[in-house]
From Swiss-Prot:
It is found in: Membrane. This is Cytochrome P450 71B23. Coiled coil: none annotated. Gene3D superfamilies: Cytochrome P450. GO terms for molecular function: heme binding; iron ion binding; monooxygenase activity; oxidoreductase activity, acting on paired donors, with incorporation or reduction of molecular oxygen. It comes from the Eukaryota. It comes from Arabidopsis thaliana. GO terms for cellular component: cytosol; membrane. The gene is CYP71B23.
Length: 501
């Protein structure tokens, strides 16, 4: 008998032992309902497709608190605002850790980051650094000129297309906007002038990095699964992508450490962290390292370059499909701001009402991250009367909550008016609308992301009228989704801009 076959038999024996042990323990608990399980793989076969849609279909059968068995990993899926509040508020501290996956461990530099690191002293120190130094209101305001300048450049490029009456690939244009803002404020790199990164290579790197995190890995679900990851090539693919990411981040750091480098009047995120690392005390407190810096800029890169662009694209898709809403929001924007503006600033955002409802409705119907990153219970808790054992993974399906007919009338309809006279907001305090999460794990870059979405969409609506290319109608607009963690529109939206005179 070959060594490999012996290994597989031992692995099978181990899995059977784990399954029977878990069954014995779980028989004494009131666990959430869920679909029937197959031997060994559990419920993995139910996730054949986009996970948020697969889980939406299962929610309709098994309810808002549902348990799946993914290999040997128990996962509880939350699909109601009441259950989400219990997880993210009532039991926030008890379940604010993160499960370990091979991809998250690798891309976060062994959890030297904020997004994927498990809860503990090091994570708390990094989170405090982010809130006070990197994403404070003062820092947010200091980067306002970057957001406004990049939007000015977008308007200029769209105006050139308007003169030719040529269609614009909005997906591409909005990625350039979002990535350019992130590169300037985080890395100090002007995407239009950088010597070592350009728009296409950044888009490719971001896409590959996101997909590898969501790709199936045996080691995430089975003991000894790393052997099969090596055989299937998953480990090799992950290491290759990480090498490219690490190479990019090393170039960013090397550029910042060049002797005689001119530091901008407003230091970027990397400048701030390098300065903190150089000035930190030598006592026993938390020490910031180069890997921490790379872990944090990895978070910013992966979470920042695509989410805002995805949200603006979904908003424009729904507006072009709903001419009534498009006219209403453009009438408000142009009436409030006046007819003769040649530039939009972030101060203009405070004057708009219906426009803000359009943003809310986009977040409800098309959250960029429809599944919040999974949490891990650090103690046994109860959710909606069900027992959730320690070490259980917990995932909130924001997509399902946004389509709950008990919360939203005609939930599939794009109708911003549903938020008139509603106090529901998207900053983590209302559990009906959670595009940025809530609690201790809420997205630390939320304010920056909201500003990028609002200012980008406002420029598109104020300066341009929009139409479909000749021969196409609203019925031709494809709403099919694609993605891994960030879910965007599969087929790009091509529109013809007409600059308002």
């Amino acid at each position: 008998m070959s060594i490999f076959l012996c290994f597989l038999l031992l692995l099978l024996l181990l899995l059977v032992t784990i399954i029977f042990t878990r069954k014995s323990q779980s028989s004494k608990l009131k666990l959430p309902p869920g679909p029937p399980k197959l031997p060994i793989i559990g419920n993995l076969h139910y996730l054949n497709g986009l996970p948020h849609k697969c889980l939406l279909n299962l929610w309709k059968i098994h309810g808002p608190v549902m348990q799946l068995q993914l290999g040997y990993v128990p996962l509880v899926v939350i699909s109601s605002n009441q259950a989400a509040e219990e997880v993210l508020k009532t039991h926030d501290l008890d379940c604010c850790s993160r499960p370990e996956t091979i991809a998250s461990k690798t891309i976060s530099y062994n959890f030297k980051d904020i997004g994927f690191a498990p809860y503990g002293e090091e994570w708390r120190a990094l989170r405090k650094l982010a809130v006070i130094e990197l994403f404070s209101l003062k820092k947010f305001n200091s980067f306002r000129y970057i957001r406004e300048e990049e939007n000015d450049l977008l308007v200029k490029k769209l105006s050139e297309a308007s003169e030719k009456q040529s269609p614009v690939n909005l997906k591409k244009a909005l990625f350039t906007l979002s990535a350019s803002i992130v590169c300037r404020l985080a890395f100090g790199q002007n995407l239009h002038e950088s010597e070592f990164i350009d728009e296409d290579s950044m888009e490719d790197l971001a896409s590959r990095s996101e997909k590898i995190q969501a790709k199936f890995a045996f080691s995430n679900f089975f003991p000894g699964g790393w052997i099969l990851d090596k055989i299937t090539g998953q480990s090799k693919s992950l290491n290759e992508i990480f090498a490219d990411l690490d190479g990019f981040f090393n170039q960013v750091l090397d550029d910042h450490l060049k002797p005689g480098r001119k530091v901008l009047e407003t230091p970027d995120v990397v400048d701030v962290m390098i300065d903190m690392m150089n000035k930190q005390s030598q006592d026993g407190s938390f020490k910031l390292t180069t890997d921490h810096i790379k872990g944090i800029i990895s978070d910013i890169f992966l979470a920042g370059v695509n989410t805002s662009a995805t949200t603006i694209l979904w908003a424009m898709t729904e507006l072009i499909r709903n001419p009534r809403v498009m006219k209403k929001v453009q009438d408000e924007v142009r009436t409030v701001l006046g007819e003769k503006r040649d530039r939009i600033t972030e101060q203009d955002l405070n004057q708009l009402n219906y426009f803000k409802l359009v943003i809310k409705e986009t977040f409800r119907l098309h959250p960029a991250a429809p599944l919040l990153l999974p949490r891990e219970a650090m103690a046994k808790i109860k959710i909606q009367g069900y027992d959730i054992p320690e070490k259980t993974q917990i995932m909130v399906n924001v997509y399902a909550i946004g389509r709950d007919p008990d919360l939203w009338e005609n939930p599939e309809e794009f109708k911003p008016e549903r938020f008139v006279d509603s106090s529901v907001d998207y900053r983590g305090l209302n559990f009906e609308l959670l595009p940025f999460g809530s609690g201790r794990r809420i997205c630390p870059g939320m304010t920056m992301g909201i500003a990028t979405v609002e200012l980008g969409l406002l420029n598109l609506l104020y300066f341009f009228d929009w139409g479909l290319p000749e021969g196409r109608t609203v019925k031709d607009i494809d709403l099919e989704e694609e993605g891994a963690i960030i879910i965007g529109k599969k087929v790009s939206l091509e529109l013809v801009p007409t600059r308002r005179q």
